A protein has these predicted regions:
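A surface-exposed partner-binding patch
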Residues: 1-99, 103-105, 145, 163-174
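Short, surface-exposed, charged loop/turn segments at secondary-structure junctions
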Residues: 102-107, 114-116
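Generic detector of low-complexity/intrinsically disordered segments
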Residues: 14, 20, 104, 133, ...
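Glycine-rich, aromatic-bearing surface loops/beta-hairpins
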Residues: 121-123, 133-134, 147, 154-165
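Short, charged/polar low-complexity linear motifs in solvent-exposed/disordered segments
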Residues: 59-61, 126-130, 153-154
Length: 174
């Protein structure tokens, strides 16, 4: 049984790795994003917006800004990766995004890394086999680099990361 987005958020909050937004507009954001996505929205994305995650470690969440009046709404961040069948959910702070896959149909969507170098044309590598697993991996990212963990350390947290269909795991991406 896999971990849910809410469970992952609770784990990370208990560790002090997760910071929440205090905006309180989750329902409006969910409605607005669902409309932008043509009426369909992955359950994990909805769960992330309900959790109102602002950041995990140094990684900022991409939270759409809700506007009550439709004429005040802007395209915003939601549309940045739609050409690549994804929705941006986190920034790496260097202009790149982690995006939740929208091309997975009825399967639980994976998370991929999108590089600004190619204008986010395609996913470069798999960042998590599910949104919940991705959140746990993201919280370990900087520590893993500092410790010099070997390639594939991610499998200890996300045993299915190397099975993501649209891009290889980071240690296989080259």
């Amino acid at each position: 049984m896999d971990i849910t987005v809410s469970e992952a958020c609770r784990v990370l909050e208990a560790r002090g790795a997760l910071r929440r937004s205090r905006r309180g507009d989750a329902e409006g954001v969910i409605q607005q994003v669902r409309e932008r996505l043509g009426g369909r929205m992955p359950a994990d994305l909805e769960a992330l917006y309900r959790e109102q995650v602002a950041s995990i470690g140094d990684f900022a969440a991409i939270l759409p800004e809700w506007r009550e009046r439709p004429e005040w709404r802007r395209e915003g961040s939601v549309g940045l990766l739609l050409h690549a069948d994804a929705v941006p959910i986190f920034s790496d702070g260097c202009g790149n995004f982690y995006g939740l896959d929208l091309a997975s149909g009825d399967q639980r969507p994976a998370v991929y890394f999108f590089d600004s170098e190619d204008m986010f044309e395609r996913p470069h590598w798999a960042a998590g086999s599910s949104l919940a697993r991705f959140l746990l991996l993201l919280a370990e990212h900087d520590q893993a680099l500092d410790e010099g963990r070997p390639p594939g350390w991610e499998l200890s947290i996300d045993p299915d990361i190397d099975k993501c269909p649209r891009a290889p795991a980071i240690w296989l991406a080259g």
